Amino acid sequence: SWNVSTACWTGSPVSESQVIPFWGPDQKELFSLMAQALDPEHAITAAMYALAPIKGRVLLDVGAGAGDRTIPYAELAAHVFALEPAPAALPLLRDRIASSGASNVTVVPAGAEAIPLEDNCVDVAYATWSYFFGPGSEPGLLEVERVVRPGGDLAIVQNHGHDELSRFWASTESECETWPPWFAKRGFDCEIVDTTWRFRTRDEALAVLEFLWGEPARRYVLEHDRVQFGYKVAIYHRRILEHLAERN
């Protein structure tokens, strides 16, 4: 029978220039706490599934990281290509896949700017907080569109700002303002999802938020004495009817 993983895979090596540092292996406990706290009601995933369904389809997971989202995707998708360039993340990703028993996931050690898959090879591409940070990510956008079949979907999740936590990354929130027009120019719709970071204890909230954003975050948690914090993301979605290079 036709094997999607071997039919699409070209085996090109990853370029070091595409690697964003991955801190999960050095801070495993904090990384785990953050993953548990983020979007506990799964509102983000539900919105992604509604915009770009993956049930029975071939999915490209751009920036798979340690596989926290890859494994749930594999429960629905026909096959998942887990694209991850960071060497530190790859052992965790492979271990997570092995322990889950998922047989329909192919790890692709590469970045978004040079995806070693054939043209028109996947039905859907997801990217959650990876690579697509507005201006400058055009090369990766062209590559992802190349591997998505006509009629397929691309869904990109990024911070929206204008929420309780964005006060701690002022420069990033300013950068977020440039993203909606950048994506809109390239044919993307945008859906805002209101969700939360919900920790089990104040100590967990202190540990994670202080690690991420320092003393201002620590003071905020202590002053407000709670474990849940408002958070908004933007999901940029586009149906791939024609490639970006053909439109511009």
For each feature predicted by the language model, list its residue ranges:
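A short SAM/SAH-binding and catalytic strip from SAM-dependent methyltransferases
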Residues: 123-138
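Class I SAM-dependent methyltransferase SAM/SAH-binding core
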Residues: 60, 65-114
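Conserved Class I S-adenosyl-L-methionine
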Residues: 184, 189-248
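A short glycine-rich, Lys/Arg-flanked "PGG" loop and its adjoining helix->strand segment in the class I
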Residues: 138-150
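A short acidic, Gly/Pro-enriched loop at the edge of an enzyme's catalytic core
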Residues: 113-125
